[in-house]
């Protein structure tokens, strides 16, 4: 058997069901791995070992009685620290939420607990999910397990690094402009951004309310399908949740992609893309052709406007969402002679520089004199971007593109150059603006660092993406590669 800490979710489920492994043994292996690697990786902000072991013991007892709740029963999982967990610190990577313990669970947490998963802790992220490197956390900088001098991506960098380092078999992340997919690619794991509305956002600390989506991160597409079977589905507590039936995602993994038409959008192979990244991506796309898919070159002409459009809409939504954090009822509170001075000092000291930058940008875009020139126009361009996807999906079943124009970059290289950092998400932002689903699978290496292939689907057609990603993983072994932390 593979080292316990590097088991996939699917392999762990098989071993648990066969009685070859107990949930307690698996949880103890994960906790030991976290203790051994956390000084290098710094993925976790808060651990819950006692609760995790208690949940694992309960899972073992259910399995002994033949009453396992789901294939995830007894599987440890980590949670990005923007998702509310009852009684467990939830900071969104921000000083302003220091010490905050939510009085309720997010819907995705309720569903994971009902399925018997073992919640092992909360994972580091860029503050309020604003960033592409996890350097914006108020608490620590997470490193990439393939090279600890480099970033893991962001904003779900802790979620990606924890899987890649073998700390947990799977995690939840969130994706507002690429925050599941880019770190998955940079850390050599698989990650899915579901369609907007497919997974409940109730209990998610919002960054951009029309863009955010919760999704799974793990080694394999089969693992993602198992998690989606638990977390997907309508939630009446979330007004943005789609009242649609959800398929059995594992049943979609047939291995057969013959006859599918895959579009290759020319705009995604951007100027400045590293040659090794483009080569690995094109090689992966060729594998799909060899498996029976038809490749079609297509165009998404408004892609070039996605970056400025996103950086008007997302900060505008952040400006509104983050207005609620004032230190009056919970979290960090600064001193002040008056209530208004206290609030001003709390927000000035509690928010980090990138969050303050985006709040100011969003407030400016929403101001009376500039609303039409910026925010309204950005929403109009967003409609054109969405229309591009609608039209291209009349011709093809899905799209295949690079995920990031580069491999993981050195820590500190871009943190003082916001535009360079924003360009890291040039291949992922349009998908959030359009609200469609996208999957990332590892597809090779460039200069010894992982590269990810991005597959983009029709709205609510995650099943086809998972089918194609799983078929790709059946004939390649990139998802089986593991970093050597002794050399990282």
Swiss-Prot record:
MF (Gene Ontology): ATP binding; glutaminyl-tRNA synthase (glutamine-hydrolyzing) activity
SUPFAM superfamilies: Amidase signature (AS) enzymes
PROSITE patterns for this protein: AMIDASES (PS00571)
PANTHER family: GLUTAMYL-TRNA(GLN) AMIDOTRANSFERASE SUBUNIT A, TRANSAMIDASE
Annotated GO CC locations: glutamyl-tRNA(Gln) amidotransferase complex
Subunit structure: Heterotrimer of A, B and C subunits.
Protein's name in the database: Glutamyl-tRNA(Gln) amidotransferase subunit A
Domain of life where this protein originates: Bacteria
Enzyme Commission designation: 6.3.5.7
Active site feature: 80 (charge relay system), 155 (charge relay system), 179 (acyl-ester intermediate)
Function of the molecule: Allows the formation of correctly charged Gln-tRNA(Gln) through the transamidation of misacylated Glu-tRNA(Gln) in organisms which lack glutaminyl-tRNA synthetase. The reaction takes place in the presence of glutamine and ATP through an activated gamma-phospho-Glu-tRNA(Gln).
Alphabetically ordered keywords of this record: ATP-binding, Ligase, Nucleotide-binding, Protein biosynthesis
Family, similarity comment: Belongs to the amidase family. GatA subfamily.
Disulfide feature: none
Catalytic activity: L-glutamyl-tRNA(Gln) + L-glutamine + ATP + H2O = L-glutaminyl-tRNA(Gln) + L-glutamate + ADP + phosphate + H(+)
First-level EC class: ligase
Organism, scientific name: Chloroflexus aggregans (strain MD-66 / DSM 9485)
GO biological process: translation
């Amino acid at each position: 058997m593979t080292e316990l800490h590097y088991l996939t979710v699917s392999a762990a489920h098989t071993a648990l069901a066969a009685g070859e492994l107990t949930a307690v043994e698996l949880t103890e292996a994960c906790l030991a791995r976290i203790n051994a690697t956390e000084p290098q990786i710094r993925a976790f902000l808060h651990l819950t070992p006692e609760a995790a072991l208690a949940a694992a013991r309960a899972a073992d007892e259910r399995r002994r009685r033949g009453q396992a709740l789901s294939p995830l029963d007894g599987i440890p999982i980590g949670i990005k620290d923007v998702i509310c967990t009852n009684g467990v610190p939830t900071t969104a990577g921000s000083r302003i939420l220091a010490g905050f313990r939510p009085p309720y669970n997010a819907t995705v947490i309720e569903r994971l607990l009902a399925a018997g998963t073992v919640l092992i802790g909360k994972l580091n992220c860029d503050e309020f999910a604003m960033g592409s490197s996890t350097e914006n956390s108020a608490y620590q900088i997470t490193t990439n397990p393939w090279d600890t001098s480099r970033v893991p991506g962001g904003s779900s960098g802790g979620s990606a690094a924890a899987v890649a380092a073998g700390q947990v078999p799977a995690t939840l992340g969130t994706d507002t402009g690429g925050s599941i997919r880019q770190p998955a690619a940079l850390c050599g794991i698989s990650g899915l951004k579901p369609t907007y509305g497919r997974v409940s956002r109730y209990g998610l600390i919002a960054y951009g309310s029309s863009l955010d989506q919760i999704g799974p991160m793990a080694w394999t597409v089969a693992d993602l399908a198992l998690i989606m079977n638990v977390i997907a589905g309508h939630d009446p507590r979330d007004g943005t949740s789609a009242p649609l039936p959800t398929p059995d995602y594992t049943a979609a993994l047939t291995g057969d992609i013959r006859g599918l038409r895959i579009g290759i959008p020319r705009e995604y192979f951007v100027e400045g893309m590293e040659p090794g990244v483009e080569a690995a991506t094109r090689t992966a796309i060729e594998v799909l052709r060899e498996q029976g898919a038809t490749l079609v070159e297509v165009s998404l002409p408004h892609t070039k406007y996605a970056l400025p459009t996103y950086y008007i809409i997302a900060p505008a939504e952040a400006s509104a969402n983050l207005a609620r954090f004032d230190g009056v009822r919970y979290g960090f509170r600064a001193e002040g002679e008056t209530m208004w001075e206290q609030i001003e000092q709390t927000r000035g000291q509690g928010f980090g520089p990138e969050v303050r930058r985006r709040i100011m940008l969003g407030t400016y875009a929403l101001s009376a004199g500039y609303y039409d020139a910026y925010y309204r126009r950005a929403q109009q361009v967003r409609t054109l971007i969405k229309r591009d996807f609608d039209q291209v999906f009349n011709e093809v079943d899905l799209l295949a593109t690079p995920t990031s124009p580069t491999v993981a970059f050195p820590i500190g290289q871009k943190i003082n150059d916001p535009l360079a950092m924003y360009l890291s998400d040039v291949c992922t932002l349009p998908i959030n603006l359009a609200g469609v689903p996208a999957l990332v699978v590892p597809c090779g290496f460039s200069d010894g660092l992982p590269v990810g292939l991005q597959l983009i689907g029709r709205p609510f057609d995650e099943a086809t993406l998972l089918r194609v990603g799983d078929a790709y993983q059946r004939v390649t072994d990139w998802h089986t590669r593991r970093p050597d932390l002794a050399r990282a």
